[in-house]
UniProtKB/Swiss-Prot annotation:
Active site residues according to the UniProt entry: C50
Miscellaneous notes: During catalysis, the active site Cys acts as a nucleophile attacking the alpha-carbonyl group of tRNA-bound glutamate with the formation of a thioester intermediate between enzyme and glutamate, and the concomitant release of tRNA(Glu). The thioester intermediate is finally reduced by direct hydride transfer from NADPH, to form the product GSA.
Domain notes per entry: Possesses an unusual extended V-shaped dimeric structure with each monomer consisting of three distinct domains arranged along a curved 'spinal' alpha-helix. The N-terminal catalytic domain specifically recognizes the glutamate moiety of the substrate. The second domain is the NADPH-binding domain, and the third C-terminal domain is responsible for dimerization.
Protein name: Glutamyl-tRNA reductase
Gene source species: Escherichia fergusonii (strain ATCC 35469 / DSM 13698 / CCUG 18766 / IAM 14443 / JCM 21226 / LMG 7866 / NBRC 102419 / NCTC 12128 / CDC 0568-73)
EC number: 1.2.1.70
Residues given in the record as NADP(+) binding sites: G189, A190, G191, E192, T193, I194
Length: 418
């Protein structure tokens, strides 16, 4: 039995290839069935995200194994083999175990240490268990990777600092406001970055969210997900006074929030402070707003300096995490080798018990027929000894004939001979 990990990711393949190799959720069961129909595959898990598609497999070793699996992947997705080969990586046994642990821990992610990948790995594993998981070693490898990822998060600071613009914006808000459960947040825009911001804020139980966007339909989809109110961009001037925090990210070529607008809002708020985080390029908030008393304006450049500092901290934590992964990989491989030995021990014991039962039955039958008890017992002992030492004796003789002293010494050691 061999453990394999093969696939492509953001480091080895462009998005144009990654999207062609991805497995859609509605066809995943079909893909797993097709994969497990391959004669060499004992068990499989398919991990498919926007940044990676990977197969984790338990296989029987055979000639041209790599060729067969690449051919299956290309046939399934109707790909040219040469296009895939240039981007494909292949890990076996120790390297496959280490790779999965690194992936689950966020060490192989586009954003170092990002936590979402662990949930994606867990879902891929759960999907594989719907009648597809047939290899206990593969199952154990995934369970181990989950505990390793948890250990990495607990024992290092890999996830402690914000390294995305969206997360950095939310982190800044949490640093300035003691609790988000008492604040109102105005989000301007409804693109991917604002979506991430909204989800982070929901996780931290913000009191109220308002989403202002050019098109109401797009904003409404996000609002329904996070429990927010939707307003038009033209309503911002009137509603700005309600917001303790404003986070803006649109594609507008001109500022949406001007100095006069913020001045009016501050006056209505009786100069209660406002945090404005402008993560748009070009800027959504006029720079002059930052000169107003009680208006604290941060631009995307301010966030990038926070991110750069935090990324350096994550890289330092990643060194500690890699040490944990190396240790846990070694322990898992020791367990795996022990499992192989356990199967051999079970077979050897079963064989010995079969010989014992066969000869004992013959001896008991002879006793029932009135045979001499002492002679029967001596015959049993002699036959049992000969049957048990027959195979080791043949191996010793063959090693001697071959002049294989190393094998002779291994056999002597295995038989407990001085």
């Amino acid at each position: 039995m061999t453990l394999l990990a093969l696939g492509i990711n953001h480091k080895t393949a462009p998005v144009s290839l990654r999207e062609r190799v991805s497995f859609s959720p509605d066809k995943l069961d079909q893909a797993l069935d097709s994969l497990l129909a391959q004669p060499m595959v004992q068990g499989g898990v398919v991990l498919s995200t926007c940044n990676r598609t990977e197969l984790y497999l338990s296989v029987e070793e055979q000639d041209n194994l790599q060729e067969a699996l690449i051919r299956w992947l290309c046939d399934y997705h109707n790909l040219n083999e040469e296009d895939l080969r240039k981007s494909l990586y292949w890990h076996q046994d120790n390297d496959a175990v280490s790779h999965l642990m690194r992936v689950a821990s966020g060490l192989d992610s586009l954003v170092l240490g990002e936590p979402q990948i662990l949930g994606q790995v867990k879902k891929a594993f759960a999907d594989s268990q719907k009648g597809h998981m047939k290899a206990s070693e593969l199952e154990r490898m995934f369970q181990k990777s989950f505990s390793v990822a948890k250990r990495v998060r607990t024992e290092t600071d890999i996830g402690a600092s914000a390294v995305s613009v969206a997360f950095a914006a939310c982190t800044l808000a949490r640093q300035i406001f003691e609790s988000l459960s008492t604040v109102t947040v105005l989000l301007v825009g409804a693109g991917e970055t604002i979506e991430l911001v909204a989800r982070h804020l929901r996780e931290h139980k913000v009191q109220k969210m308002i989403i202002a966007n050019r098109t109401r339909e797009r904003a409404q989809i996000l609002a329904d997900e996070v429990g927010a109110e939707v307003i038009a961009l033209s309503d911002i001037d009137e509603r700005l006074r309600e917001a303790d925090i404003i986070i803006s990210s649109t594609a507008s070529p001109l500022p949406i929030i001007g100095k006069g607008m913020v001045e009016r809002a501050l006056k209505s708020r009786r100069n209660q402070p406002m945090l404005l985080v402008d993560i748009a390029v070009p800027r959504d908030v006029e720079p002059e707003v930052g000169k107003l008393a009680n208006a604290y304006l941060y631009s995307v450049d301010d966030l990038q300096s926070i991110i750069s500092h935090n990324l350096a901290q994550r890289k330092a934590a990643a060194v500690e995490a890699e040490t944990i992964v190396a240790q846990e990989t070694s322990e898992f491989m020791s367990w795996l080798r022990a499992q192989s030995a356990s199967e051999t021990i079970r077979e050897y014991r079963s064989q010995a018990e079969h010989i014992r039962d066969e000869l004992t039955a013959k001896a008991l039958a002879a006793l029932e027929q009135g045979g001499d008890a002492q002679a029967i017992m001596q015959d049993l002992a002699w036959k049992l000894t000969n049957r048990l030492i027959h195979a080791p004796t043949k191996s010793l003789q063959q090693a001697a004939r071959d002049g294989d002293n190393e094998r002779l010494n291994i056999l002597r050691d295995s038989l407990g001979l001085e």
